[in-house]
Structures are given as structure tokens and as C-alpha cells.
Amino acid sequence: MAKKRNTSKGLQALIDGKFIVHNDSFYKAIVAAATPDGTGPSPLEEDFEANFPDPLKFLPPKGDEPTERGETAYVPNPNRQDMFDGYTFVFYEQRQHSTLFAPISEGHGKVLFREVIPDETTVDDFVRYVKDVAGEKGLGEFEDGSEGKGVVVVRFNPVKGAGSEWFADFSRQVAQYLDHRLIEQNEFLDAILGNDASVLRRPLLPESSGIVAPPPTAGKCSLTQYLIPS
């Protein structure tokens, strides 16, 4: 259970083929269904399948993640379990790496961390590292044009505090060197719901400054299908 949709455990649940539900309201619905009405049996005792709360009616509230998908997109999909196979995600901020390590790994993707220190790490050094991960040399763009499976760089964008301007400039330069759109952390939810990791790996648009918005998005169950993340 969760209070938000776009959490590490929530994403992992979707990869694993589980529902995600809002903790308080779903608990209350189960308690109500399990409580006898007067002297008769409880609704669950009367007909478990018919009276068990529909998890899609108890989704956690929406956050600021860029997705407009309806509730049916949250139905467990076993095909998501290997959706990141062939993709390598490079992080340069430790908390982002820790947050997304489990769901990406669960989806058979690779997760790497390369520390970046403001005013110390150079764009050239980072680009060389990313290209080396991709099995390429030099400082130019990806040889495959950032299309299909391959390496994806996850952008770190602190909105305030020391280093915020430095990181913004760093990400722009990396994107331009690689001709590669650096993705935002909150884009993973929509990709997982659509079972399409390819939307996370795209070339930089010519008119872009390095930040490109993602494209618009268009049963019976057992208790083991539910994840209640903390």
C-alpha cells in the first residue's frame, strides 16, 4: 500500500505484477467487507470474489509524474517483468540511484552510478564514461542515435541549493555531446504503465536545450497480487 503512485516500491510492484493501492482507504474497505452485518455473515464470507474491494478503485493519489493514463493501466501485467532488458541506466546522483535500483533491476535492466562532483567532474570525463558503458569511444553522440535499447542517462535537477545552476549546465552539455535526451526520474511511471522502455531513450531534438518533455500518454485477483509499500 502507498500514499503515492510514483514510489520505488510502487514501481517495483507494477514490474512484479501487483496492484498498488492507497493504504488507509483500502484497509478500511477490507475491514468493512469483512465485518458482519447484524447477525448474518460478512460480505466477504457471503461471496469473497464479488465483495472483495476492487483495487483499481483505491489507487494512491496522483503526483506530479507526467502521465495521464487511466486506472486500467494499473492492472498487473506480467509482460513488464523484463521490460528493461537490454537497457543500462546511468545515474550521477546517489539518492536517485538508490530509489530506482530495485524497480529497474526487477525489470532486468542494468543500473550504474557514476559520482559527479560540482566544479570537479568535467563533462568530457562523464561523457567518456557513458560512451565506454555503451561500448563506444570518443566524445561524440551515440552511434545508434539514441534509438532502441542501450544506455540511458538519468538527469539530476536540483531546483535550489548549492550546485543547482552547475548541474543544470552539466546536464545540458552532456545531452548535447551525446545528442541524447536525459530523462527525468518521474518519467519511469508512465513508461512502466505502458510497458514501453523505448520512450525513455531518444535523441535530443534540434530545437531542444537538453530538456524534452515526454510524449503524452494515451479482474479477479488474489491477496498475493497486492503490494503495500511503506
Regions found by a protein language model. Name each.
Residues 47-76:
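Short N-terminal or domain-adjacent regulatory/targeting segments
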Residues 1-57, 95-229:
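BRCT (BRCA1 C-terminal) domain core and associated BRCT-interaction motifs
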